[in-house]
Amino acid sequence: MAYPLLVLVDGHALAYRAFFALRESGLRSSRGEPTYAVFGFAQILLTALAEYRPDYAAVAFDVGRTFRDDLYAEYKAGRAETPEEFYPQFERIKQLVQALNIPIYTAEGYEADDVIGTLARQATERGVDTIILTGDSDVLQLVNDHVRVALANPYGGKTSVTLYDLEQVRKRYDGLEPDQLADLRGLKGDTSDNIPGVRGIGEKGAIALLKQFRSLDALLEQIDAAPKRYQTLLREQAEAARFSRQLATIVTDVPVQLDLEAARIGVYDRSAVMALFQELEFGVSSNLIKKLPSVVQAPTLAELPADLPAAPLTTAPTQLSLFAGESEPAQPTAEPPPVTIVRDATALADLVSRLRNAPAFAFDTECTSLQPVASDLVGISIAIAPDTVCYIPVGHQSETQVPCGEVVTALAPFFANPQQPKFAHNAKFDMEVLAGAGIKVSGLAFDTMIAAAMLGKRQGLKDLAFYELKLPEPPTTIEDLIGRGNKQISFAEVPVEQAAPYAAADALYTLRLTERLQRQLEAEPALHDLYYRVELPLIEVLTDMELTGIRLDQEYLRELGRHFAQRIADLVERIYQQAGGPFNINSGQQLNDVLFGRLGIDPRAHGLSKLKSGGYSITAEVLEELSQLYPIAADILTYRQLTKLKSTYIDALPDLVNPRTGRIHTSYNQLGAATGRLSSNNPNLQNIPVRTEEGREIRRAFVAEPGWRFVAADYSQIELRVLAHMSGDENLIAAFQQGLDIHAATASRLFGVEPTAVDKNQRRVAKTVVFGVIYGISAFGLAQRLGIERDLARQLIDNLFAQFPGIRRYIDQTLEFGRQHGYVQTLFGRRRVMEDLRASGARRAAAEREAINAPIQGTAADLMKMAMVNVHRALREQGLRTRLLLQVHDELIAEAPEDEVEPAARLLRDVMSSVYRDLVVPLSVNLEVGPNWDEMSPLAMG
């Protein structure tokens, strides 16, 4: 017989688990409010409700001092103080429970465990089964035929839940029954709750005693029958055992009364939950909304909790607001207007007429691939006004639609008109898809994705629309239309009638978000200027770079692959010979067996500590150290390097060549790094090693077109020049202004010698110290890097600060600004949130290291982006055919016809060196030219 089911939630236990499990994620709203614990709690709770599908649910919370504290002053003593960030999130957790209309139970003088134990007993008496959802194993003592425990362990962003019934409890505790677990804690104690137990008896011994005597009382009555090693302990600490059991026993007669009708699932106001999720900026991608219980009926006004916050909720006053003076909250959006599907010439002509009179429009594309250059256009959506939205299908299968060529002819003039502003979300992607169909986009006036990222918001359109526009329900996702995994179909297979509302909504959301995000940027003048001066025009630059791509010498790469394969085979043979036989070199376990077993290497002699699995982590650093004594370690390290390069680049790159263009088209993430730097993927061309011969061999495969040359322009020591400007250090500024070798000049001051007397080692040390300091290195870290004593490393750092006091001043001022504001910023106002500067211990130390470097690295990234925009514009204005291809670290790589090499190089140097004239030190640009990415020669120009 199936009984009704009640889920009882240990609110405090789950809240704490979620807080500490997800703390490192740093999840926050764009206003700076920490939300990671709320998210983790919601994820556990809603997943459980979706999986167990209970009829009823209730939550119990602790309320402070309990009878156990009165019995034992040291109860739970020694626990770390609850971090401040927990409390506002705990209030949000209670708001979530209230919004779901789940009753909350508390009892003065009792813990949540006691309340849960009482409610579970009452449920059983009323013929209702119970699942207790908790993160605390103490409640396993409550398990019986009608009570189970779902024990949640949310770590690393994922939640593992184990459901314990009687059999599972017996398995965990080697045959003990749940009603023996309080006795177990009475014997072994509990360090987490500071329950003493019997000193000298651990869990293994306690379980053995309870299996022999069944109960603590029976054991204490027959101490003489216990193993001799325990007899004295038990006689001397019998009262401690009984007292510990009393502390560990969950009370089941707390003065609370279970109200099943109030606990019925599905009687809640869904809009209140939506409002809370929007306030916390939990979007569609989190999947929380899909896990919400179905609304059986909305609660009456009398049934709603009196203290349920009105929607939209306001930010707790204790939280930092990064956007003071933000525009007014959006009002909930009504149902989107009907979409016009442009299926024939008449509808297309009507759209053209509307576009002719439109002051601006938002657009979006649907296509067949996530790789825009390799994709086919399926449809275009256009929003001219909130009530004028259309979808133009051009590539759906078996559908009546206007031929793509006719659509392109009709719409291309509007997209190409620079005087007609256009808005998009992830415009670069859509512009590349349209370019493939023959439509060039000019006049891009706003990209909501880039604006959202600069404002510290989540960048997905569906998430952004949901919480910024206060949509009553989450938008349809692409997975809702095309499915997932093996069952996924192409968008071209989606019927137009289903595709149109989805596609048109994206354009409409973009139109509405543009107005809202524009106002938010206007409230932040520095970000507003950076957005319109750098990030927005950069979109066109990156679009052109990605569309251009770079040529790959595939025959050379095939030959290189054969060469690498032979080298790897030779290495494998040599490794086998040294190991005394073949083994799986890629297996960590087998590598452990060979190095520390068969070859007898002592891991402790090299400072290695065991993993939980019992083996040792054999990292590149470990192999580097071992290689000084054992040739096999050097060979294994080389084997790893070669196999990684071969699989990542040599084998993979040919598959990434676009058959339409014969070139590789990497994709740039405009805000891919927290500092604002660009990142690239598919493939990642920024990670190809440059300092090793193998890396240079791979770079040699990237070649210029016949009759063209690569021209590379590299900023020299840009981060140190930025440091000189931002620190205002006179000595550092003077060295750059005089054109000195900065590392030799630094070494001269650091070691107290004449610049001409600085040797190579002193220069190397000075370079390491300076870069280490601006990356927040400690004396310990510097000592390790240089292989010197820590005291000497500290002395070097102190000497640097003494000779360059502006650097010390910059560090102190940056950290103080970060602590006060919760973020640090570049010279141009780009922010990086640094809430952990207010934390303690290792988290604060890590945040301080990042905070010191972020403004420097971020400003260098801003300067590079400005240079890219200016170079792109100058090339066009001067009518040169030269085109930008790559941006790697501090370097721009262009491809120029042979007769344009010198003018292109001069343009690159002049534009890049003058990108920001207010810098107090000159920007120096080194030039190189060559037929491929490796064989580049310095280019000297007057």
Curated annotation (Swiss-Prot):
Function of the molecule: In addition to polymerase activity, this DNA polymerase exhibits 3'-5' and 5'-3' exonuclease activity.
GO process annotations (BP): DNA-templated DNA replication; double-strand break repair
Lyase in keyword set: no
A molecular-function term among this protein's GO annotations: 3'-5' exonuclease activity
Listed transmembrane segments: none
Protein name according to UniProt: DNA polymerase I
Catalytic reactions of this protein: DNA(n) + a 2'-deoxyribonucleoside 5'-triphosphate = DNA(n+1) + diphosphate
Record-linked Gene3D superfamilies: 3.30.70.370, 5' to 3' exonuclease, C-terminal subdomain, 5'-nuclease, Ribonuclease H-like superfamily/Ribonuclease H, Taq DNA Polymerase, Chain T, domain 4
Quaternary data: Single-chain monomer with multiple functions.
SMART domains: 35EXOc, 53EXOc, HhH2, POLAc
The 3'-5' exonuclease domain, residue ranges: 340-522
Domain 5'-3' exonuclease, residue spans: 177-269
SUPFAM superfamilies: 5' to 3' exonuclease, C-terminal subdomain, DNA/RNA polymerases, PIN domain-like, Ribonuclease H-like
The entry's keywords: DNA damage, DNA repair, DNA replication, DNA-binding, DNA-directed DNA polymerase, Exonuclease, Hydrolase, Nuclease, Nucleotidyltransferase, Transferase
